[in-house]
Amino acid sequence: WFTDGLGTLKSVAIAPAELEGAFAEGIGFDGSVIEGFARIYEADMLAKPDPSTFQVLPWRGESPGTARMFCDLTLPDGAPSMADPRHVLQRALTKAADLGFTFYTHPEIEFFLLKQGSVPGTRPEPIDQAGYFDHVPHGNSHDFRRAAIGMLEAMGISVEFSHHEGAPGQNE
């Protein structure tokens, strides 16, 4: 996994037998077609999996399991890609640390749950009409949030709390 210059998640699947080669050499791809990356004459790029980010995906219950790793993006000579958002963040964090700053972050994920089967071209319908902090036990929103929290915690991501937000179908 990696993101383009606009933050869109990108991915490539690799067979387990090819993983050692990906660690050693990277996975080649055409950077000129990734939004915010290279010009056509700088197209050759490599995605190098970072083993420290290895994580089994709990929602993919099949056997064998599925895992993900984030990748560092490099040029063929091994130099980091200046367009790699991960590298940009690492450089910024290093500069901040050199100045005595520490970086803290905490995501707040909000989303809407919509009914299935909406007719294309029509306005999507929220799954409920609940409001801020409304308690709807055994409702679809409540059950979805519980399942999502379970998967996040299975990946080692702690969740402080969840609740219904102010708009119909809106959750945090």
Give the predicted meaning of each segment.
Residues 1-172:
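Glycine-rich, acidic/polar active-site loops that bind/position phosphate-bearing ligands
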